Amino acid sequence: MISELKRCQDAAGDGYLCGVPNGRKMWKEIEEGNIRASGFGLNDRWVPLYNIHKMYAGLRDATLQTGSKEAKEMLVKLTDWMIRLISKLSDEQIQDMLRSEHGGLNETFADVAAITGDKRYLKLAHQFSHQTVLQPLLKQEDKLTGMHANTQIPKVIGFKRIAD
């Protein structure tokens, strides 16, 4: 499976690897700062950040569980792609994007930092930490009532992973 995914990533040419319909168009809009986020949608797509998180998590797991060098290289390329994608966005724009369900991207980016020793990926993990959830928790305030638990738990696991 990894070798077939690698063929897809290599064909993309820039490290991108994800199955979001018309994803290239959507990611280009985001890169340009055109962000339209809602609880589950981002730029008229259904949970694309959650979708790509699953790719990151799968590549991370293949790296850690099997020692696959190919999966590690793919994971790093995909993470570098994300760094380039958001490089011109403000913190506010990134936080706006995180209103859309995004899984545990902060956790996987922290894991990439641990795997590689590259602090750029830890910075990315911090950037993908949803402050609307994190800040009240840091103040020991419970603001989670009414929030979808399956959406919040991966974020909190990511906060913990960053702290480790």
Residue ranges and their predicted role:
Residues M1-D164:
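Glycan-recognition and catalytic cores of secretory/periplasmic carbohydrate-active enzymes
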